[in-house]
Curated annotation (Swiss-Prot):
Gene: rps2
UniProt protein name: Small ribosomal subunit protein uS2c
Compartment(s) where it occurs, according to its Swiss-Prot or TrEMBL record: Plastid, Chloroplast
UniProt main location, coarse: plastid
Covalent S-S links between cysteines: none
Family recorded in the similarity comment: Belongs to the universal ribosomal protein uS2 family.
Classification via HAMAP family: Ribosomal_uS2_B (MF_00291_B)
Keywords: Chloroplast, Plastid, Ribonucleoprotein, Ribosomal protein
Record-level GO cellular component terms: chloroplast; mitochondrial small ribosomal subunit
GO biological process, one term: translation
UniProt-listed SUPFAM superfamilies: Ribosomal protein S2
């Protein structure tokens, strides 16, 4: 609880800016911010990596140390969460498509769940090199997967020999591992959201090469200069990621609802 008390004093110094979480007045916003920071603490977002693994570029976002690990400044987490959500809402309003990437055990479920609920794309098992930079080839493999899944629903499988059925299943499962969440993706996404910088570095590098805006969760061993938009926070916990991705989902839906209203009017 000591960390929360120290953090509460920082809330009074938050800049008065309009964000996706803006309230009717500054006093009301202070109350909301304090509640959010407490919720972030309960979700474990303040828990950084081992101090010996830290990246000095993350110093502005670190509050201190505790039992050999860095403690992330949750006021910074809140401010950057607001900025990211405003960006996602704006991009959704423009009609941009989103790709969620998280291939670790604790991030896989969060990424898939958020992508499905926002009608977005996802990669949650393994990132295949060239998935974006060599999209022409990747797209052919996506089509192949769709074709195999279609055949699976017919009587075609019954006509195959045991070996042919095994080969069919092996190819289908291999393609599902890489492309299941990309089955409806016809072109490159407008924004890529990464559950972790270090764990999803290959995907991040492809975004940089293609100049696709990226949103990344940064732990204390990450490099903030590599990401277009980022949020300092614990990237090693399902609970922490689920907390942040819930706000991503709401921001995207808010932007799309605004776009729909503009279309109707």
């Amino acid at each position: 609880m000591e960390i929360i008390k120290k953090t509460d004093s920082f809330v009074k110094k938050l800049p008065r800016k309009t964000t996706s979480f803006s309230a009717r007045n500054w006093e009301e916003k202070q109350v909301i911010d304090k509640k959010l920071i407490k919720s972030m603490f309960e979700a474990g977002l303040h828990r950084g990596d081992l101090t010996q693994n830290w990246n000095p570029k993350m110093a502005p976002y670190i509050r201190g140390e505790f039992k050999g690990k860095h403690v992330i400044n949750l006021v910074q987490t809140l401010l950057y969460l607001e900025e990211v959500c405003a960006f996602l809402e704006k991009e959704a309003l423009k009609g941009k498509k989103f790709l969620f990437v998280g291939t670790q055990t604790h991030s896989s479920v969060v990424v898939k769940k958020t992508a499905i609920r926002t009608n977005s794309f996802f990669v949650n098992e393994k990132w295949l090199g060239g998935m974006l930079t060599n999209w022409k080839t990747a797209k052919r493999l996506v089509r192949r997967l769709n074709f195999l899944l279609m055949l699976e629903k017919t009587t075609y499988i019954q006509k195959l020999s045991k070996k042919e059925r095994n080969d069919f299943k092996k190819e289908k499962n291999k393609l599902k591992k890489y492309f299941l969440g990309l089955r409806s993706m016809q072109k490159l996404p407008g924004v890529v959201i990464l559950a972790s910088q270090n764990q999803e570095m290959n995907a991040l590098k492809e975004c940089q090469r293609l100049k696709i805006p990226s949103v990344t969760i940064l732990d204390t061993n990450s490099d903030p200069t590599l990401s277009d938009y980022f949020i300092p926070g614990n990237d090693d916990s399902y609970k922490s990621l689920n907390f942040l991705f819930k706000f991503f989902r709401l921001a995207i839906k808010k932007g799309r609802n605004k776009r729909q209203q503009l279309t109707i009017n």
